[in-house]
Amino acid sequence: MAKKVVAIIKLAITAGKANPAPPIGPALGQHGVNIMMFCKEYNARTADQAGLVIPVEISVYEDRSFTFILKTPPASVLIQKAAGIERGSGEPNKKKVGKITTAQLREIAQTKLPDLNANDVDAAMRIVAGTARNMGVTIVD
C-alpha cells in the first residue's frame, strides 16, 4: 500500500548550502521531518551545481518520512549567470543591463525544458527570451 502524502513543501535553496536555519528548519519542522537528514541529502545531490538556486519539492508522508524532487534553476538565475550580471534592471524597457547570445539562450532553454510548459526547444527559447526581456537583458545573434 502506498504511503499517504500529508504535505508538499516547495523551497528554493542555494545548491550545497542547505542548513537547519530559517527558512528550511521551520518549514520542515512543522511537519515533523528530520531536518538534518534532508539537509545532508540535498547538499549531496546538489554539490555539483554550487552557487545556483535549486528549487525543491518535498513530499512529506504520514510516517514523517519524505522524498524530494529537484527542479531546474530559475530562468532568471541562469540568464544572470550567462550575462555576467548581479541582478536584472529596475527599468527593463529603458535601461538594458546585459546581453546574451542566441546560443546561450538555446542552452538555457534546453536546461529549463523539463520544467517549462513547452513542447520543443523553440517554444522554450521564446519563454526564456521573454524572461530575459523583462530583466533588461538583450538577446544578440
Swiss-Prot record:
One of its GO terms (biological process) is translation. InterPro entries: Ribosomal_uL11, Ribosomal_uL11_bac-typ, Ribosomal_uL11_C, Ribosomal_uL11_C_sf, Ribosomal_uL11_CS, Ribosomal_uL11_N, Ribosomal_uL11_N_sf. The keyword Oxidoreductase does not apply. The keyword Ribosomal protein applies. PROSITE patterns: RIBOSOMAL_L11. SMART domains: RL11. GO terms for molecular function: large ribosomal subunit rRNA binding; structural constituent of ribosome. GO terms for cellular component: cytosolic large ribosomal subunit. It holds the Pfam family Ribosomal_L11. One or more lysine residues are methylated. Keywords: Methylation, Ribonucleoprotein, Ribosomal protein, RNA-binding, rRNA-binding. Forms part of the ribosomal stalk which helps the ribosome interact with GTP-bound translation factors. Belongs to the universal ribosomal protein uL11 family. PANTHER family: 60S RIBOSOMAL PROTEIN L12, LARGE RIBOSOMAL SUBUNIT PROTEIN UL11M. NCBIfam families: L11_bact (TIGR01632). Part of the ribosomal stalk of the 50S ribosomal subunit. Interacts with L10 and the large rRNA to form the base of the stalk. L10 forms an elongated spine to which L12 dimers bind in a sequential fashion forming a multimeric L10(L12)X complex. This is Large ribosomal subunit protein uL11. It comes from Cyanothece sp. (strain PCC 7425 / ATCC 29141). The gene is rplK.
